[in-house]
C-alpha cells in the first residue's frame, strides 16, 4: 500500500511539473491597444516637512490617504498630509511596544487589515497592528535551511534566492510577496544564463498566517533575455504589483510587455508598448568586475523600466521608465483596462507610489547634503 501511495504522489508531482513546463508563462499580446487622446496633465514639486529626525535613507509611500516616509536605518515611520506637513511619527529602534529590534528595515508593506509588515536585512519579519504596536504572536524568523557550496539544491527552493534589487514588496490577504534575485555561483543569470532563463523563480511568498515561506512563483524569463546575458544582466530585475482580486502584473527592466497572472500565477495575457526615446543599446559585460564598473553606470545612461504600480482607486497600471542620458526627462505610462491611455514626460527619478485625490505621487527625492526631501505630484484632467 505504501508503494502505491508513493508512486501516486510521484505521479502528481511529475504531472504538476509537466503542466507548468507546458504553459506559456510569457504569452504574446493578442490585442495591444493605445488611446492617446490629448489629456492635460500638470506636474509640480511638493516639499516634505523635514523638521523630523531622519537619515534620509528610505522610501515614501501612500497609506490611508496620507503620505509616509519609512526610515530604514532609524526604523521610524513618519506620516504627512497631502501638502507635505508632518502629522505624526511612530516606530523606532528598541524593545518598547511601538519599537522594533529588526536592525535595519530592508522592505515593508501594509496589509489590507491595516497591519504593517517589516522585513529586515536578516530573515526577521516583524508585524505591527494598525495602531503600530508590535505583535509578537505574528512575528517570526524565516526558516532558511543551511547548505554548503556544491550541495544539490532545487531551483524551486527558497534558500537559492535572496530579495531582489530594486526591491519590491506587496501584499494580498495573509501573504506578502517579494521579488527575487539569484547570486549563487552555480545558478545566476551571468554565469549560468541558459539554465537561469528556464528555471529562475521570480517571486517569493511569505505566508504570514502560517509563519512560513510559501510559494516560489514564476518560472523562467521572457524570450528577450535568452542569449543576451552579457547585455541584459544589469537590466533583469522583476517589478510587480497585485490588484484587489489577487492578480499579478509583472514587468521586467528591459521588456516592453506587462504580463498578467491570476492569483495562482496562471498566465492570462500580456500588453504594453515601448516607452518613448529609450536608449536600449546596452553595453556588454564580460567579467564580474565590469558589473560593478561600467555595468551599474548604465543605470544613469540607458533606457529601462524603473517601477510598476497598480492604482486601485483609478484602476490604472502605472509604469515609469528611464529614457537615456541625453534626454532631460523620464517617462510614465498609464494603462487603463490594458489600454495605453498616456505616455508622458516626467522629471528624472519619478517612480509612482500611489494616489491621493486628485494627485498621483512619486517616491521621495532625497538630498541628504541639503537636508531636503520632496516628491512630485501629477494631476491628470
Residue map of PLM features:
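Sec-dependent signal peptide recognition
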Residues: 2-8
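Hydrophobic h-region of N-terminal signal peptides that target proteins for export
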Residues: 10-17
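Eukaryotic scaffold repeat domains enriched in small/polar residues
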Residues: 17-381
Amino acid at each position: 500500500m505504501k508503494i502505491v501511495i508513493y508512486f501516486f504522489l510521484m505521479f502528481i508531482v511529475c504531472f504538476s511539473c509537466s503542466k507548468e513546463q507546458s504553459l506559456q508563462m510569457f504569452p504574446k499580446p493578442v490585442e495591444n491597444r493605445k488611446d492617446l487622446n490629448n489629456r492635460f496633465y500638470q506636474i509640480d514639486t511638493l516639499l516634505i516637512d523635514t523638521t523630523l529626525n531622519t537619515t534620509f535613507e528610505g522610501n515614501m509611500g501612500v497609506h490611508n490617504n496620507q503620505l509616509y516616509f519609512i526610515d530604514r536605518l532609524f526604523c521610524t515611520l513618519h506620516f504627512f498630509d497631502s501638502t507635505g506637513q508632518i502629522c505624526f511619527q511612530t516606530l523606532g529602534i528598541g524593545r518598547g511596544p511601538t519599537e522594533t529590534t529588526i536592525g535595519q528595515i530592508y522592505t515593508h508593506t501594509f496589509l489590507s487589515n491595516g497591519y504593517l509588515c517589516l522585513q529586515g536585512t536578516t530573515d526577521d519579519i516583524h508585524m505591527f497592528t494598525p495602531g503600530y504596536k508590535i505583535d509578537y504572536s505574528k512575528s517570526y524568523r524565516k526558516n532558511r535551511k543551511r547548505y554548503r557550496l556544491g550541495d544539490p539544491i532545487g531551483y524551486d527552493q527558497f534558500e537559492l534566492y535572496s530579495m531582489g534589487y530594486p526591491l519590491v514588496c506587496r501584499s494580498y490577504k495573509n501573504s506578502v510577496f517579494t521579488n527575487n534575485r539569484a547570486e549563487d555561483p552555480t545558478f545566476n543569470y551571468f554565469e549560468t544564463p541558459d539554465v537561469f532563463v528556464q528555471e529562475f523563480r521570480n517571486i517569493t511568498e511569505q505566508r504570514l498566517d502560517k509563519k512560513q515561506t510559501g510559494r516560489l512563483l514564476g518560472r523562467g524569463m521572457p524570450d528577450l533575455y535568452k542569449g543576451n546575458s552579457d547585455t541584459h544582466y544589469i537590466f533583469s530585475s522583476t517589478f510587480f504589483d497585485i490588484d484587489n482580486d489577487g492578480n499579478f502584473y509583472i514587468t521586467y527592466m528591459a521588456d516592453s510587455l506587462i504580463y498578467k497572472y491570476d492569483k495562482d500565477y496562471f498566465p492570462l495575457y500580456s500588453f504594453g508598448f515601448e516607452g518613448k526615446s529609450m536608449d536600449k543599446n546596452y553595453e556588454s559585460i564580460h567579467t564580474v568586475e565590469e558589473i560593478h564598473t561600467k555595468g551599474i553606470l548604465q543605470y544613469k545612461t540607458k533606457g529601462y523600466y524603473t517601477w510598476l504600480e497598480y492604482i486601485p482607486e483609478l484602476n490604472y497600471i502605472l509604469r515609469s521608465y528611464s529614457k537615456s542620458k541625453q534626454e532631460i526627462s523620464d517617462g510614465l505610462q498609464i494603462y487603463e483596462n490594458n489600454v495605453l491611455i498616456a505616455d508622458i514626460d516626467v522629471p528624472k527619478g519619478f517612480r509612482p507610489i500611489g494616489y491621493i485625490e486628485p494627485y498621483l505621487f512619486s517616491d521621495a527625492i532625497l538630498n541628504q547634503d541639503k537636508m531636503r526631501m520632496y516628491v512630485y505630484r501629477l494631476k491628470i484632467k
